Amino acid sequence: MQGSSLVSVFTLLCLSLPVSAHQDHQGGIKAEQGNAKLAPFDIIHTKISSEGNTALFHMAVSAKAGSSKPTATGELAGSHVFSYVWPTSIDSYSVGFERNVGILALAVTSHPDFDDTPLFDENGDGDLKNDGAVWHSHWVVLQPNERCGEGVLGVVDIPEGASPRLPSTWPGLPILLDSPGWDPTFNDEVVEVRVPFADIGAVETASFDGVTAGLRVHQSVHAPLLCVVDVMDVSSGDLSLPGRVNR
């Protein structure tokens, strides 16, 4: 009798495992698997949902998320950034920038050659200036920039002498980038970020996509400074932002 019960329990567990895994990827954008060179950046699912006044940014990939980082070069110019990115239709004004100045995206990044979160000590060693390799979050504003390449996106530069509206946690770089300190979490193939909003309605009406990409820092500050140079994967395949929050 006991053996029969154990078999029944085991059978139920086996049947429930695929269902649970499938439920993890309900809604959002389901992406084609196996079309990225690096499995930790091969997107299989992207989703944004809201819980009260908090937005949950979710991305699942086909291998352990966050397990691959750029190789340090020892120099800022020419150094690389790896990123998990959620481009959205959210107005850039909602997070502290001017209104509608480009594509507002949440990005989780790693870059061992520089630190751009001067308010935070991600590795807990007491030094605020050596944490670039630790995965961390940014708001970035993106626009097509021909100086990055034909049809290529770059982080929007701040022209010399300009004083645009900027978030209070702007790190001082001459680009539309914020370092708000929302810690990403990694759990096997999933990376997530929880972001509080004063007006969650700005998120709940938004559309979104998912991108994994490499960026490169240029030698000249306004060359532009930071360009997308390697799009590893796009959830929709065409950056059409088909995702809808809470769907």
Please provide the spans of the model-predicted regions.
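Bacterial N-terminal signal peptides that target proteins for export
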Residues: 1-7
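N-terminal signal peptide c-region/cleavage motif recognized by signal peptidases
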Residues: 16-18
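Intrinsically disordered, low-complexity eukaryotic regions enriched in glycine, serine
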Residues: 25-36
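Surface-exposed, glycine/proline- and aromatic-rich loop segments on solvent-exposed faces
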Residues: 38-143
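Acidic/polar low-complexity flexible segments
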Residues: 88-92, 205-247
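Short helix-loop boundary/capping segments
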Residues: 143-196
